[in-house]
C-alpha cells in the first residue's frame, strides 16, 4: 500500500476521515496482533499505518481548530456590535 500525500488526504470530507481513522486503527491492531503471535507480516506496514493514522488525526484536529477559531471570531463580532 503506498501512502497518499497529505494534500490528497486533505480533500477527504470529515466523515471520510473518521472512517479512514477507524479502518487504520483496525489495521494497526491486526498488524500488532500478528506481530505478537509471531505470524508472518510486513514490518513496514506498521510504520505506514502509524504514519497514516497520524496524518488523518492531524487533519481532523486542524479542521476542528479552524472551526473553533471561526466560532470565536463570530462571537467577538457579535459582542462588539
Curated annotation (Swiss-Prot):
Similarity-based family: Belongs to the universal ribosomal protein uL29 family.
Keywords: Chloroplast, Plastid, Ribonucleoprotein, Ribosomal protein
Organism superkingdom: Eukaryota
Protein name (database record): Large ribosomal subunit protein uL29c
UniProt keyword Signal present: no
GO terms for biological process, alphabetical: translation
Secreted in keyword set: no
Localization (cell): Plastid, Chloroplast
HAMAP family, per the entry: Ribosomal_uL29
GO cellular component: chloroplast; cytosolic large ribosomal subunit
Taxonomic classification: Eukaryota, Sar, Stramenopiles, Ochrophyta, Bacillariophyta
InterPro entries reported for this sequence: Ribosomal_protein_uL29, Ribosomal_uL29, Ribosomal_uL29_CS, Ribosomal_uL29_sf
GO molecular function, one term: structural constituent of ribosome
